[in-house]
Each structure stands twice: as structure tokens, then as C-alpha cells.
Amino acid sequence: LEFRRVLFRSGKLAAEDANLSGGGVANAFSGAFGSPITAKDAPELHKLLTNMIEDAGDLATRGAKEKYMRIRPFAFYGVATCNTKEQDTLSKNGSYPSGHTSIGWATALVLAEINPQRQNEILKRGFELGESRVICGYHWQSDVDAARIVGSAVVATLHTNPAFQQQLQKAKDEFAKRQK
């Protein structure tokens, strides 16, 4: 019975993660972070994460996706995903590596740096975002594993960018003020 509950919770979370859009990445981490990450509640942090999405996602993964054009599990097996509206579009681009996972893991690394007191919860949530891609049939496990490496490399590279460093410091300062 407990196993069924775990499977149900995992499937429900995976379906929710499949619908990330707009501020969805920031919203997905609000619970793990311990406070809302919205443009209203944490404008500097929200801006930092919004700016990172393209770097960690499409820009970081597009080349490999185009080169390998690995078929996605749902297309390979002919089954539905957690969000059938995306299936047609996703079946036309490569599975390897997972852009969503790269974004999720990069976000987790940066948030854990800003709020180290909650790093376990944050990193767990980042890990779960990737696993959701496997549960929903969008990606193979190796797509997700590779994407975590990509996300880590993106964060390391972003730390050499003065604009990123400046925005990161603003987000850290904003977070510190909110903690007082």
C-alpha cells in the first residue's frame, strides 16, 4: 500500500512538473526554497532565475539534441505522456539531453547557493524535476543524467559572467533582507 502511495505522489508531481511554463520553474522551487519565488515577493531572485532559463535550457542542450535526435520514450513505445498537448511538438525534437532537467538542476544549484540552510530540500526538488521527465515518458534516464552535468556546467560558466555575478549578489542581498 505504501508503495502505491509513493507511486501516486510521484506520478502526480511528475504531471505537475510537465506543465511548467512562465514562472513555473520558480514556482516549482518555492516550497523547497522555503518562501515564494515570484516577481512580487522576490523580484531580484525571480529575475535571476528567469534570466538563467534560456542559458540552462535551449542554449545549453540544442546542439546535442539536434546532433543525436534521440527518439523520446513515449514516441518509441507509442504511449501517452503526462501532457498530451506537447507530444506532437516533442516527438519532432531530440530527447538527449533533457532541457527541462538542465534548467531544473541549474536552478537548484543556484538556489542552494543563495539559501544553504535549505540545500537538501532544494537539491532534492531539482533532482525530482529530472525524474519527472522520465516518469512522464519524455526522456530516458540517461538524458536526465547527462542534463544534470550540463546544468552544472552552465552554472559554473555563469559564475564567470559579470552580469550573472551582479544579479546573483542582488538576489543574495534580497534574500538576506527577507530573513531579518
Predicted segments with their positions:
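Interfacial helix-loop-helix junctions of multi-pass membrane proteins
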Residues: 128-159, 166
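Short alpha-helical linear motifs
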Residues: 69-74, 144-152, 172-175
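C-terminal membrane module of polytopic membrane proteins
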Residues: 154-180
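Hydrophobic alpha-helical bundle signature of multipass membrane enzymes
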Residues: 1-135, 160, 167
